């Protein structure tokens, strides 16, 4: 009788122990599942953000439609680079852009000068010597001439360009040796996205009756 009672108690204790182990396993599995779900959610959000940034990086950038120059019979002393955002590009803040230009012997880095800004959306002569973008031009600062800007996003203090905008970057290139047949290379590098590529060779001769020439 005592043996049967002992065996019954032993089975009861064993059943309780098994139940405790089972509950512990369920709790551990629940915690593990919660951690996995949270980690999965974080990784998904991170991947989505990274993918969006990568898409913006690839799609965004600048394109150069043409480069015009004005010469003084021996060198190109004024250069205007016409730029617009790439198709599908995010808005680009030109105050953060950097322009690098080289003639093979010299290299110049230009940054934006807020005082060298001109709005010509109603028309005008970009190469007019009286324009502030040339008066304030230096060997290290570039100016901006706004040609097309429907939403008026490109201002002197915040020169941001977006879809449909067209501006000219103005450079004082007097410090370069841009004599005839000189190769010029460079980039207009925005804060993010693809740069605009500058690559041209100056004309074989500079004619008095044609002060403004197309370079690229």
UniProtKB/Swiss-Prot annotation:
Q: Which PANTHER family match?
A: FLAGELLIN B1 (PTHR35903:SF1)
UniProt source species: Methanococcus voltae
Sugar attachment sites are 38, 72, 77, 113, 172, 208
What InterPro entries would the database entry show?
A: Flagellin/pilin_N_arc (IPR013373), Flagellin_arc (IPR002774)
Give an example GO molecular function. Answer: structural molecule activity
What name has this protein been given in UniProt? Flagellin B2
Localization (cell): Archaeal flagellum
Q: Which residues form the propeptide?
A: 1-12
What post-translational modification does the entry describe? Answer: N-linked glycans consist of the 779 Da trisaccharide beta-ManNAc(Thr)-(1-4)-beta-GlcNAc3NAcA-(1-3)-beta-GlcNAc.
Keywords, A to Z, come to: Archaeal flagellum, Glycoprotein
Pfam families in alphabetical order: Arch_flagellin
Report one GO cellular component. archaeal-type flagellum
> Lineage of this protein's species?
Archaea, Methanobacteriati, Methanobacteriota, Methanomada group, Methanococci
User: What function does this protein fulfil?
Assistant: Flagellin is the subunit protein which polymerizes to form the filaments of archaeal flagella.
What is the similarity comment for this entry?
Belongs to the archaeal flagellin family.
Superkingdom field: Archaea
**A single GO BP:** archaeal or bacterial-type flagellum-dependent cell motility
């Amino acid at each position: 009788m005592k043996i049967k009672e002992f065996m019954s108690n032993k089975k009861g204790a064993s059943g309780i122990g098994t139940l405790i182990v089972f509950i512990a396993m369920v709790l551990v599995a629940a915690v593990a599942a919660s951690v996995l779900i949270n980690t999965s959610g974080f990784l998904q959000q991170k991947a989505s953000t990274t993918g969006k940034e990568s898409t913006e990086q690839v799609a965004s950038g600048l394109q150069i439609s043409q480069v015009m120059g004005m010469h003084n019979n021996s060198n190109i002393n004024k250069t205007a680079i016409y730029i617009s955002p790439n198709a599908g590009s995010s808005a680009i803040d030109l105050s953060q852009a950097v322009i690098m230009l080289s003639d093979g012997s010299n290299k110049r880095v230009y940054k934006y000068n807020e005082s060298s800004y001109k709005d010509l959306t109603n028309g005008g002569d970009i190469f007019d010597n009286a324009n502030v973008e040339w008066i304030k031009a230096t060997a290290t600062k570039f100016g901006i001439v706004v040609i097309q800007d429907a939403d008026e996003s490109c201002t002197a203090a915040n020169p941001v360009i977006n879809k449909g905008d067209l501006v000219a970057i103005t450079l004082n290139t007097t410090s370069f040796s841009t004599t005839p047949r000189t190769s010029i290379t460079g980039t207009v590098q925005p804060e993010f996205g693809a740069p605009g590529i500058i690559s041209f060779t100056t004309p074989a001769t500079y004619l008095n009756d044609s002060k403004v020439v197309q370079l690229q």
